[in-house]
Swiss-Prot record:
GO terms for molecular function: lactoylglutathione lyase activity; metal ion binding. The active site is at residue 208. Catalyzes the conversion of hemimercaptal, formed from methylglyoxal and glutathione, to S-lactoylglutathione. Belongs to the glyoxalase I family. It catalyses: (R)-S-lactoylglutathione = methylglyoxal + glutathione. Residues 88-212, 218-342 form the VOC domain. This is Probable lactoylglutathione lyase, chloroplastic. One of its GO terms (cellular component) is chloroplast. It is found in: Plastid, Chloroplast stroma. One of its GO terms (biological process) is response to cold. Binds 1 zinc ion per subunit. It holds the Pfam family Glyoxalase. Keywords: Chloroplast, Lyase, Metal-binding, Plastid, Repeat, Transit peptide, Zinc. It comes from Arabidopsis thaliana (Mouse-ear cress).
Amino acid sequence: MVRIIPMAASSIRPSLACFSDSPRFPISLLSRNLSRTLHVPQSQLFGLTSHKLLRRSVNCLGVAESGKAAQATTQDDLLTWVKNDKRRMLHVVYRVGDMDRTIKFYTECLGMKLLRKRDIPEEKYTNAFLGYGPEDSHFVIELTYNYGVDKYDIGAGFGHFGIAVDDVAKTVELVKAKGGKVSREPGPVKGGKTVIAFIEDPDGYKFELLERGPTPEPLCQVMLRVGDLDRAIKFYEKAFGMELLRTRDNPEYKYTIAMMGYGPEDKFPVLELTYNYGVTEYDKGNAYAQIAIGTDDVYKTAEAIKLFGGKITREPGPLPGISTKITACLDPDGWKSVFVDNIDFLKELE
């Protein structure tokens, strides 16, 4: 950006930025000559008449303003594109210590279906996809088992997953019967009427059970803790194109939540951001991995993420071997997300 030096009221002073690229006017030489010949008019020092100096300064101002306008246009264009992009939360990825045990718990206690499973022996890991409907239209779970690793640190930053069920009490009884852990018995949420309960899976991941009627997305929430809620909301609105659905402050318990997503909570999965008063950083552990989101253009997505404060950890482009285009990033709190090309994602499922 061109730097504009303010003009003095008593004289016309050209910006040194206008001359700094010219070998004829190195700044050190100008300073030395100025000190030796202060009695010479400035217009003669630079070999320019006053009206030419004025025109040069005005041109510099014009360049700066044009640059600002172009930047503003780029921001506006990207904001509009992000808002119009066809985005959907595809799956949430995390690591488990015993794949078979976890699949058994999710299918028998939580009513999920095993959608597909793949083993990658050359890279020593296995993936399993579970959920309440096909991957091309539902938010699902992607479990990762790394050979020989049976335990992970969940950390303090990850909160819980949310699952909508018809009858919370009945689900809790089933969890107990299967040897699962219940960390909060069924009952109304504090300050509200919705019946909830909290359970833990065999690896210690927490699940909030929410009593709701029939919903197209039973796997309905991912809760993450953030150190600056306003910053996080702005980032997810601008860079991810999410909508702020609602906020709720709980001064009695010293925390605030914000629900972000691509549609209403009762029909779409949401990201629940939680801010605990006075806590600005969290240990994220090594268990929770990321959320995957569909996009029509991973390249433009990466541009928007960079522009609005995110960090790209994998530049946009195809994955080796399968040609699926992705880009990966960190939000301002360090939570990872991966954007996947919509068409490529559907091809993977064929």
